[in-house]
Curated annotation (Swiss-Prot):
Pathway assigned in UniProt: Cofactor biosynthesis; coenzyme A biosynthesis; CoA from (R)-pantothenate: step 5/5
Keywords, comma-separated and alphabetical: ATP-binding, Coenzyme A biosynthesis, Cytoplasm, Kinase, Nucleotide-binding, Transferase
Enzyme class: transferase
Lineage, broadest ranks: Bacteria, Pseudomonadati, Pseudomonadota, Gammaproteobacteria, Vibrionales
Family: Belongs to the CoaE family.
Name used for this protein in its record: Dephospho-CoA kinase
Any one GO BP annotation for this protein: coenzyme A biosynthetic process
Its EC number(s): 2.7.1.24
Main function: Catalyzes the phosphorylation of the 3'-hydroxyl group of dephosphocoenzyme A to form coenzyme A.
Ranges of residues in domain DPCK: 4-201
Transmembrane segments: none
Length: 202
C-alpha cells in the first residue's frame, strides 16, 4: 500500500487548499473523510438504511436522501442519539477510507481528516501533516467565510482539538498564515520528501 500522509488542521486552516495543490501540481491521490462520510449514508447504502430503521422514514428528504438538518436537530437534543450515530458511522467511515487507500495509484496518498486527532485516526497514517494557523486567523477566516459571529466560531474551536494538541502529533507542519505566504513552495518541499520516503516504503 502507498505511503499515507494524514492531513489535518483546525477550522479554516486551509486543509482543502493544501490538498488541492498536492493534487493539481503533483497528481497525488486524496481520500477525504468528509466525502467518505457522505458516501456511507448515500441512498441505497447500509448506513442510510440503519439510520432510517432507527429514526424513521421522516429522516429522509422527498428525494430519499438523508435530511442532515433534521438529523442534526435530533442528535443535538439527545446525546445518546449522537453516540448511537457515531457508533454506527465511525467504523463504516474507517473501513471505507482503508478500502479507498488500498486503491491509490500515486506514490503516496493524502488522507484528509479534519478531526484526525479527535477521532484518533493517526493509526491509519504513516505521517501526520498539520496545516497550522493562529487562532485569530481561524476566527477571522471562519467569520468571513461562513457569515457567523465570533462566539459561534469560538464554540467550534472549543469542540476541536487545540492547536497545541495537533502540533504535538505532527510529523510535518505547513504554515498557512498569510495570503502571500508561499504555500506551494512548502508543499513542493514536502512532496520531494514524501516521494523519497515512498521509495523506502516499497
Amino acid at each position: 500500500m502507498a505511503l499515507v500522509i494524514g492531513l489535518t488542521g483546525g477550522i479554516a486552516s486551509g486543509k482543502t487548499t493544501v490538498a488541492n495543490l498536492f493534487q493539481q501540481h503533483f497528481a497525488i491521490d486524496i481520500v477525504d473523510a468528509d466525502i467518505v462520510a457522505r458516501q456511507v449514508v448515500a441512498p441505497g447504502s447500509a448506513g442510510l438504511a440503519a439510520i432510517v430503521d432507527h429514526f424513521g422514514a421522516d429522516i429522509l428528504t422527498c428525494e430519499g436522501e438523508l435530511d442532515r438538518g433534521q438529523l442534526r436537530q435530533r442528535i443535538f437534543a439527545h446525546s445518546e442519539e449522537k453516540q448511537w450515530l457515531n457508533a454506527l458511522l465511525h467504523p463504516m467511515i474507517r473501513r471505507k477510507m482503508i478500502e479507498d487507500l488500498a486503491q491509490v495509484s500515486s506514490p503516496y496518498a493524502l488522507l484528509v481528516v479534519p478531526l484526525l486527532v479527535e477521532n484518533q485516526l493517526q493509526t491509519l497514517c504513516d505521517r501526520v501533516l498539520v496545516v497550522d494557523v493562529e487562532e485569530k486567523t481561524q476566527l477571522q477566516r471562519t467569520m468571513d467565510r461562513d457569515s457567523v459571529d465570533e462566539q459561534q466560531v469560538r464554540a467550534i474551536l472549543k469542540a476541536q482539538a487545540s492547536r497545541h494538541e495537533r502540533l504535538a502529533l505532527a510529523d510535518d507542519v505547513i504554515k498557512n498564515e498569510s495570503k502571500d505566504q508561499d504555500l506551494l513552495q512548502q508543499i513542493t518541499d514536502l512532496h520531494q520528501k514524501y516521494l523519497a520516503m515512498s521509495k523506502q516504503n516499497r
